[in-house]
């Protein structure tokens, strides 16, 4: 008669393994891969060490340079549910000569040499009716064929939600960035139409932007559309003053 503490040959023999010499096969393979990835990561970091001498802004909008805002227009638009509306068509009243002339005279002094580093299209959206609970949607395309005519209204397809400040910002700089024109005030004074086509659209994208809401009802929203110029300034060639105060 066997008890639970008796030795039963039919139960097989029991072996005790020394863990010092036996390891789990999966852990061995994982450790080998981990070491290999670590060595590759170290080599990759060494190749990037020379770049530590340079600084770059996480958000180009907050980078070096002066921001000059040109408000194109403020309008109230009605947006139906499940649809998005075109914001700017780049051929209407947003390019009034008076608006640009006032902006140029205030933002670009004649005595300074200034270069456009980047141009941002900034769209600020606000609901006109109180106590509305919805989020703003937006999507854009930077480039299209010159003869393409965008639709005024489209269906919502994979949009992105606008941030908490209800501001949608798009960088229009082409690859390489920057605008080679230095004396912007004189370039603009020569010809308004030529300045827009040759300076702005030659160096920056002309985007198509649609906005909408995730509301199930028709919403009335106030749009403020503006261009923000990121400007790099150069000191004017002015003679030094001589006198007791200097």
Swiss-Prot record:
Entry similarity comment: Belongs to the polyhedrin family.
Organism: Mamestra brassicae nuclear polyhedrosis virus
Keywords: Viral occlusion body
Keyword flag Cell cycle: no
Cited function: Major component of the virus occlusion bodies, which are large proteinaceous structures (polyhedra), that protect the virus from the outside environment for extended periods until they are ingested by insect larvae.
GO cellular component terms, semicolon-separated: viral occlusion body
The protein's name: Polyhedrin
Keyword field contains Membrane: no
InterPro entries reported in the protein's UniProt record: Polyhedrin
An example Gene Ontology molecular-function term: structural molecule activity
Organism superkingdom: Viruses
One Pfam family cited in the UniProt record for this chain: Polyhedrin
């Amino acid at each position: 008669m066997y008890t639970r503490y008796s030795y039963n040959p039919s139960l097989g023999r029991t072996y005790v393994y020394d863990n010092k010499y036996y390891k789990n096969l999966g852990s061995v393979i994982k450790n080998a891969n981990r070491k290999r990835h670590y060595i590759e990561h170290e080599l990759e970091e060494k190749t990037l060490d020379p770049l530590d001498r340079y600084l770059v802004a996480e958000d180009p909008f907050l980078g070096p340079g002066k921001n000059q805002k040109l408000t194109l227009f403020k309008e109230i638009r009605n947006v139906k549910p499940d649809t998005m509306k075109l914001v700017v068509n780049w051929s209407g009243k947003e390019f009034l000569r008076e608006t640009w002339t006032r902006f140029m005279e205030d933002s670009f002094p004649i005595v300074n040499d200034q270069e456009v580093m980047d141009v941002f299209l900034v769209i600020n959206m606000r609901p006109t009716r109180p106590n509305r609970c919805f989020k703003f949607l937006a999507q854009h395309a930077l480039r299209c064929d010159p003869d393409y005519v965008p639709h005024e209204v489209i269906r919502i397809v994979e949009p992105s939600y606008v941030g908490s400040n209800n501001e949608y910002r798009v960088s229009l700089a082409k690859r390489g960035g920057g605008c080679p024109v230095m004396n912007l005030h004189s370039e603009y004074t020569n010809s308004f139409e030529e300045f827009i086509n040759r300076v702005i659209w030659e160096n920056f994208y002309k985007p198509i932007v649609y906005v909408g809401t995730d509301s199930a009802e028709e919403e009335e929203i106030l749009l403020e559309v503006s261009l923000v110029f990121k400007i790099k300034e150069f000191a004017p060639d002015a003679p030094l003053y001589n006198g007791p105060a200097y």
